[in-house]
């Protein structure tokens, strides 16, 4: 299970990160805070290990140092804003997050801690970096995500444009380099950024390694990951890439793409084609729900529900019993009818009970977070949910694209409004 955390994030310091510091030098001032040389050195070593594990050739040390320092500065700025606005992550929330990470790696939290320490990580430091990530995630949600909405008209336009382009399920694996232009930049600053971007593009045209060039020059959020944006469907592409990317062949590099943020270069790493119709198995079901309270214990409720089930098996009408006894008032009015249910609509325990039944069968009483149930499956059918699936997917893809664009603008504004003084040696 070694190196279980390579893909989690690069800000997890190895042991020794928080050791006592003698005459530690300040390498950056970030508003009222500072970044210390020891922090920078530890982060650089961690990023070097990650890039080496990915097989990415390393840029010169001073270049990597400046890229890493910029990431530390941006982290400081976001944590400062979170602190000023009262965002906190308590130990209970933190422990739940750690438990999920351990579970995702197939481990208990205790086993996970042992693996971390065997791989050279200090667990208390790891905990605090997870806390920082959760704080920044909450900040992004409040400042960006919650302010993004998607209208019905946007979904309709998205689907119309997808049909015009064809192959709406095509996916693109992209890498990206951004050379930023400051907010309210002068013509000279714009020209300087463009000249730098053209030099970078020329290096790529001459065969330079894209990942190394991205780590060296890119101002994008994924610079230290070699500019890798991962797999994107058309609707997940930034708006300014939509007309460019479909024209590229795998391995192609785009021309310069101008945006308010600066100059972009995109490489198409790989491509995959269309998907298929979305056919799902729907279940028509009805149920009776009983809840325990101060007048009836869990055992008494379970016994009462067993008696109702036996009455149904003996010939009593399910609908009449549901109307008379069920605590789910919404479905009770319809004789317990839940209609046609698609996968994912019900909680897992309820779906598990439905899956185990053939049409006409009635379950034994079972418990969920809502109380005690008996469920009867009436029928099953295959339903083409492609249109509904496409609309839901369109909404998610539009939202993701808008969030990414807003986040980039928000981070740029946060950086431009901050006081940052670099004290690295030239």
From Swiss-Prot:
Keywords annotated in UniProt: Chaperone, Isomerase, Periplasm, Repeat, Rotamase, Signal
Q: Which residues form the PpiC domain?
A: 169-270, 280-379
- Which Enzyme Commission number(s) are listed? 5.2.1.8
**InterPro entries from the entry?**
OMP_Chaperone_SurA, PPIase_dom_sf, PPIase_PpiC, PPIase_PpiC_CS, PPIase_SurA, SurA_N, Trigger_fact/SurA_dom_sf
Subcellular location field = Periplasm
**Any one GO CC term of the record:** outer membrane-bounded periplasmic space
Q: What is its main location?
A: periplasm
Which EC class heads this enzyme's classification? Answer: isomerase
> What is catalyzed by this enzyme?
[protein]-peptidylproline (omega=180) = [protein]-peptidylproline (omega=0)
List the Gene3D superfamilies.
3.10.50.40, Porin chaperone SurA, peptide-binding domain
Give the signal sequence positions: 1-19
List GO molecular-function terms, semicolon-separated. peptide binding; peptidyl-prolyl cis-trans isomerase activity; unfolded protein binding
Please give the biological process terms from Gene Ontology that the record holds. Gram-negative-bacterium-type cell outer membrane assembly; protein folding; protein stabilization
The free-text function statement in the UniProt record for this protein reads:
Chaperone involved in the correct folding and assembly of outer membrane proteins. Recognizes specific patterns of aromatic residues and the orientation of their side chains, which are found more frequently in integral outer membrane proteins. May act in both early periplasmic and late outer membrane-associated steps of protein maturation.
Which protein, by its recorded name, is this? Chaperone SurA
Mind giving the lineage of the organism this protein is from? Answer: Bacteria, Pseudomonadati, Pseudomonadota, Gammaproteobacteria, Chromatiales
Q: Gene that codes for this?
A: surA
């Amino acid at each position: 299970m070694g190196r279980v955390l390579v893909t989690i994030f690069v800000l997890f310091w190895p042991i020794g990160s928080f050791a006592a510091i003698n005459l530690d030098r300040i390498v950056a001032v970030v508003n009222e805070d500072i970044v210390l040389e020891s922090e920078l050195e530890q982060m650089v070593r961690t990023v070097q290990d990650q890039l080496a594990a990915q097989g990415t050739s390393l840029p010169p040390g001073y270049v990597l140092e400046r890229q890493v320092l910029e990431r530390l500065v941006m982290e400081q700025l976001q944590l400062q804003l979170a602190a000023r606005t009262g965002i906190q992550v308590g130990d209970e929330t933190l422990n739940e997050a750690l438990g999920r990470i351990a579970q995702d790696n197939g481990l208990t939290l205790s086993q996970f801690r042992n693996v971390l320490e065997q791989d050279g990580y200090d667990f208390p430091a790891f905990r605090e970096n997870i806390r920082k990530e959760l704080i920044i995630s909450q900040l992004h949600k409040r400042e960006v995500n919650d302010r993004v909405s998607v209208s019905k008209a946007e979904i309709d336009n998205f689907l119309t444009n997808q049909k015009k382009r064809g192959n709406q399920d095509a996916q693109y694996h992209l890498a990206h380099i951004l050379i930023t232009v400051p907010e309210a930049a002068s013509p000279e600053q714009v020209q300087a950024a463009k000249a730098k971007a053209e030099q970078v593009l020329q290096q790529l045209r001459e065969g330079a390694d894209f990942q190394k060039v991205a780590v060296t020059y890119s101002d994008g959020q994924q610079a230290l990951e070699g500019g890798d944006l991962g797999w994107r469907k058309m609707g997940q592409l930034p708006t300014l890439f939509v007309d460019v990317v479909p024209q590229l062949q795998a391995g192609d590099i785009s021309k310069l793409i101008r945006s308010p943020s600066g100059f972009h270069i995109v490489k198409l790493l790989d491509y995959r084609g269309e998907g298929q119709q979305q056919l799902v198995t729907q279940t028509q079901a009805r149920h009776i729900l009983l809840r325990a309270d101060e007048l009836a214990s869990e055992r008494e409720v379970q016994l009462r529900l067993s008696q109702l089930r036996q009455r149904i098996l003996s010939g009593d009408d399910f609908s009449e019993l549901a109307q008379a006894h069920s605590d789910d008032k919404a479905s009770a009015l319809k004789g317990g009818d839940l209609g046609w249910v698609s996968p994912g609509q019900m909680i897992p325990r309820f779906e598990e009970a439905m899956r185990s039944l053939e049409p006409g069968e009635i379950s034994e009483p079972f418990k969920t977070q809502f109380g005690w149930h008996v469920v009867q499956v009436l029928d099953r059918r295959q339903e083409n949910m492609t249109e509904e699936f496409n609309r839901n997917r369109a909404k998610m893809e539009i939202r993701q694209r808008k969030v990414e664009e807003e986040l980039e603008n928000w981070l740029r504004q946060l950086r431009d409004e901050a006081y940052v003084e670099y004290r690295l040696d030239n």
